[in-house]
């Protein structure tokens, strides 16, 4: 198995270019394989073609909000792909939105570096559980 086959594949969707660059550098440094996308449009196709393990979705993105993108993209994604809402907004609001939209997790944008990597790995490992215990 090659090194890239062992990496957790993450698709990061955010309209903030600086945020995308920061996340890409950070997650690459922690051994993730990262792909970025600057728009809520086209995410379903990316998910279908790139088959990421995790999709980190900015909630406040123009055109379609993160929870709406999640609803559309989940239909194109393999059952093992996990969707995580990502936002700088109040954590209780983010938690509520994640629960109501069926996200597999949520992460505040204040979580960075090693803490972010640990949270993503934790959500990824939960995706390995049988579907019946995932909810």
Residue ranges of each PLM-predicted region?
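Acidic, metal-coordinating helix/loop segments flanking the phosphotransfer/catalytic sites
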Residues: 36-54
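Two-component/phosphorelay signaling modules centered on CheY-like receiver
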Residues: 17-35
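Non-catalytic signal-transmission and effector/linker regions of two-component phosphorelay proteins
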Residues: 1-11, 114-135
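Acidic catalytic/metal-coordinating carboxylates
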Residues: 38-39, 65-68
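Alpha4 helix (beta4-alpha4-beta5 surface) of REC/receiver domains from two-component response regulators
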Residues: 68, 90-107, 111, 115-118
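The feature encodes the CheY-like receiver
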Residues: 20, 62, 91
């Amino acid at each position: 198995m090659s090194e890239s086959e062992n990496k957790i594949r993450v698709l990061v969707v955010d309209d903030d270019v600086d945020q995308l660059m920061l996340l890409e550098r950070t997650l690459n440094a922690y051994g993730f394989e990262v792909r970025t996308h600057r728009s809520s449009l086209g995410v379903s196709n990316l998910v279908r073609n790139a088959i990421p393990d995790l999709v980190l979705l900015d909630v406040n993105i123009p055109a379609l909000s993160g929870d709406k993108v999640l609803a559309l993209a989940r239909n194109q994604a393999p059952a093992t792909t996990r969707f995580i809402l990502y936002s700088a907004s109040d954590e209780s609001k983010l938690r509520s939105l994640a629960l109501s939209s069926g996200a597999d997790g949520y992460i505040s944008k204040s979580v960075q570096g090693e803490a972010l990597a640990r949270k993503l790995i934790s959500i990824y490992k939960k995706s390995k559980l049988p579907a019946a215990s995932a909810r």
